[in-house]
Structures are given as C-alpha cells and as structure tokens.
C-alpha cells in the first residue's frame, strides 16, 4: 500500500524526529517544492503534542489544513488528528500497527519507501493568461470544445454567505452565447437544484454535489445510485455536526442531498483546527469521504466519483463526435477542480481561476484567469471566436 503527497493539497510535511531514513523522501519533497520540518514526539501530554505540531507547521509557514504529519507515535497521531492536519500517516516501526489507526491515522505504512510525491505541476503564478492566449496559434485554440465551469469562485465571486452568491456580471449572457456554439456544463459542489437555479440558463448540463446528480440539456435527470444509499447517513451526520459545531461563531453546516459542507470562512482562525478535526472524525465514524475546499470541509459518500469522472461521463454522453472528438475545457478555482484538470487529459485545456487563499499552490492547470470577471470575459470571447469559425 502506498500514499501520495500532493503539492496541490499539501504545502508541507512534518516528520517525527524518531523516524528512520527520512532523507530520500525529504529530497523528493524539496524537488516538488513542498516544505519540510520536524517535531519531537513523546512526553508532555496531548496538549503539548498539539503545540509541538502547530509550532512545527508555523516554522515552515504552513497551516495545519495543508500539512501532512508522518509519525510512528500514536499520541502524535491523535494530536495531529485533533488539530485538523490534512493527512496523518502512521509508520509502524515498533509493531504497534493497530494502535495508529485507532488514534486517527489515515493510513499506516511499514516504511517511508511507500510514500509517493506527485511531481510535474506548476504553481498558479507561473501559468500564462488564458485571455491573452485565446486564439493565438501558439496559445489556446480549440475549434470543437465542450466547456465545463465550476460555479463558486469561477462564475461567481466567493462571498461570506454562500446563499448570497450570484453569477458575476455578464457571465450568464456569455454562457448563453457559448451554449449556442458548443456543449456547456456547470459542475458544482452545490446541490443540483441550487446551482441550476442560480445560473438559470436552459439548454446546458448541470451537475450538483460534485457530479453525484446531473441534468442534461433536455432535462433528463441522472444520479449516482450507489451514492443515494448514503443519503440517510449524510442526514444524520449533518445533525450531529450542527450539535457539535453550531455553537462556534461563524460556522455554518450545510446539509446537501449528497453531502454535508461545513463552512468556516467567518470563524476565528484558532478554531479552524477543531472544526476540521470534528468533521474528519465524523467522516471516519460514518464511513464518509472527506474533501476540502476554500474555507470549507465536506463529507460525501465514500465512492470513487468526483468532478473529473463526471466530466468524462458527460463527454461520453455528448452527441455528434463522429467527425472529430470534442476537446474539453475546464475552468475552476478550487482543490476539487483539480480532479477535473487531471481528467481533461493531454488534449484538453485546464484553466485555473487564481486566488490567494492557499498561497501560490501547485496546480495541474495549463492556463489561468485572474477572477470570475475575467472568466465571463473569456467565455464571451470564446463564443465570438467559435461563431466566426462557423
């Protein structure tokens, strides 16, 4: 069994000083521009273990929600889990393999040779501008595209209250122009009914809950039946999270049909670790998958399905590809959009909508846009370009 450290999701790795043979992995991480730091495990109790981890993350300038902890110490595993670290890897150096997952390890390895490091991605600041590249022979030219958009942070600005989000000025008109030229789809983490109502444009694809539920341009409804079995579990998890987190100012627990999103954008920064820890514990208890995003942590059915697989499913169900295959273009801003960036493949186009909430993180995207307003402008220009091609 192996585990992958992904620079798109992880800014730093914290190593227990008691671990053996860390040098080779440290070199791989440095080559991938992932920070590294150490902490001493053992002694001092639970609060001291948490403090040691937080101080180690601070030294490398990373927040716990984007840090990996690797340790052979069960107490350090528990401390990392309770303080909201993104990934907790246990290493069985002393024959106590069962104790590590019992304390909250995401995975347990025999040694560090089983750790992989994703390589080859660029950072957001290094990407060329998609608007400047559009239509240039050496830039971005796609004569037969199918264009996919995230909603929040891509077609809409990120706002403090998710219920207040609306498409940015000109976005819906540009989408309508584009839909007259090629297939268009909105892939959102929101409920299907929510995102389709906010955009309000007929004749395009809508996918809600990261693709667990879709409607086609003709109104045909599709859902992941395996995911539907988890709906009662998600309802129960939402109620329990409201009980556990509802008293924390600035936290909002949103129950969706195929997910539970805990928003903490308006919460105090020193409460975020606890919030994440509570959600991760709920996911582990209820057998649900945990995903993260911009100031949100979510629970989903534990099924191998994401925006990338949704994109490929939609492509496979689009008509009129006999003359030439459609080329996917995907525009998104968040970690969950990286699955779609991967899925467009070497012939597709992935476009990141830049932000600074995760620093200058790595991404699989090929191009970037500066804001949702630029997304609307790009969409309109792409529609005009396609109309001239006939």
Curated annotation (Swiss-Prot):
It is an enzyme of class 3 (hydrolase). Its cofactor is Mg(2+). The active site is at 150 (nucleophile). Pfam families: Trehalose_PPase. Pathway: Glycan biosynthesis; trehalose biosynthesis. GO terms for molecular function: metal ion binding; trehalose-phosphatase activity. Keywords: Hydrolase, Magnesium, Metal-binding. It catalyses: alpha,alpha-trehalose 6-phosphate + H2O = alpha,alpha-trehalose + phosphate. Mg(2+) binds at residues 150, 152, 333. Substrate binds at residues 150-152. The keyword Lipid metabolism does not apply. Its EC number is 3.1.3.12. Transmembrane segments: none annotated. GO terms for biological process: trehalose biosynthetic process. Belongs to the trehalose phosphatase family. Removes the phosphate from trehalose 6-phosphate to produce free trehalose. PANTHER family: TREHALOSE 6-PHOSPHATE PHOSPHATASE. This is Trehalose-phosphate phosphatase. The lineage of its organism: Bacteria, Bacillati, Actinomycetota, Actinomycetes, Mycobacteriales.
